[in-house]
């Protein structure tokens, strides 16, 4: 059984001594608890002048709780004029300090709390009092990480997320930026660069509900996306001017139904799988037999097809055979060696390969049913069949 007076053998301040018994005598602070312990030790040892060491000489905290003003100034300098409403505090202490505290607490019954927990709580109270911002563990706008040993701070500003839908009117534009193609417009850059400027952010990422090929236009009711802007200085701003600037830029992208969203929307958008309707301009190396093509379209309607990963994407996709349903294939018209066809198909269907057969990797294909090679000359997505559309 330990005696309280044994605490006098350690170089501890009042706060760190009180924290050893944090789960006793509720309703008081660790500093107040340390005051009681100091008095009790003085009585137990017959030394009324006994006192714990000053915090700056404490072997556990080294006076970190007296440096809140300095830490605040470091945080304020890093945050600058960035907007935020909620914040969270985290901290890093030397492992030697953590182990020493744990050993002492074990000796006295292991009923204390860690210095990290108290620091995070107390600096959080201090920071909230100075800024008027709310301490929150639930998705905070600002996360503060304090290195107590070196008095270094790092801050992380939570990204903002903007939901919307886009149309793409060009046949030379990928959806997202490529590492091997850093220059040139993309849907991501056309949208993201403008939003990032308005938000005062440092980078951006477009998360789309699927993607169309570079040479495929996205028309009709548009494709859903969530744009993530990293390290925004401004969390709230008018969206209409941003939308107008993007839509009048002449870069071939139009956005609509735009609103602020959350990180959860990223996974929601990416997980959604919707049937799509395509307008395909199909070409043959000889004049097209309209009646044969019409029969092929009718025969392909309602069929399940089997698609092995296309050769054009095999280097970056798993080599699998996928089953896809073709809901409707309608022949719109024929002109010489070209034909316009409307195709409604399950999400994930490779439409170009549905038409050309990809050397037998897609079966049945329109070419197979027509009895002669066909290829897609131009392709547009004209509708994504979402529930609300």
UniProtKB/Swiss-Prot annotation:
- What is this enzyme's catalytic activity, as reactions? uridine(54) in tRNA = pseudouridine(54) in tRNA; uridine(55) in tRNA = pseudouridine(55) in tRNA
Q: Where does substrate bind?
A: 278, 350
Q: Could you list the residue ranges that cross the membrane?
A: none
Q: Which InterPro entries does this UniProt record tie to the protein?
A: PsdUridine_synth_cat_dom_sf (IPR020103), Pus10 (IPR005912), Pus10-like (IPR039894), Pus10-like_C (IPR048741), Pus10_THUMP_arc (IPR055174)
The record's section on SUPFAM superfamilies has: Pseudouridine synthase
State the Gene Ontology BP annotations.
tRNA pseudouridine synthesis
Q: What is its EC number?
A: 5.4.99.25
What Gene3D superfamilies is this protein classified in?
Answer: 3.30.70.2510, 3.30.70.3190
The molecular function terms of the Gene Ontology recorded here are: tRNA binding; tRNA pseudouridine(55) synthase activity
Q: Give the UniProt keywords, A-Z.
A: Isomerase, RNA-binding, tRNA processing
User: Which residues of this protein are catalytic?
Assistant: 213
Which Pfam family, any one, appears in the UniProt record? Answer: Pus10_THUMP_arc
Q: Which domain of life is it from?
A: Archaea
What does the protein in this record do?
A: Responsible for synthesis of pseudouridine from uracil-54 and uracil-55 in the psi GC loop of transfer RNAs.
Q: Which family does it belong to?
A: Belongs to the pseudouridine synthase Pus10 family.
Name of the protein this chain belongs to? tRNA pseudouridine synthase Pus10
Native source organism of the sequence: Thermoplasma acidophilum (strain ATCC 25905 / DSM 1728 / JCM 9062 / NBRC 15155 / AMRC-C165)
For this protein's source organism, the top of the classification is: Archaea, Methanobacteriati, Thermoplasmatota, Thermoplasmata, Thermoplasmatales
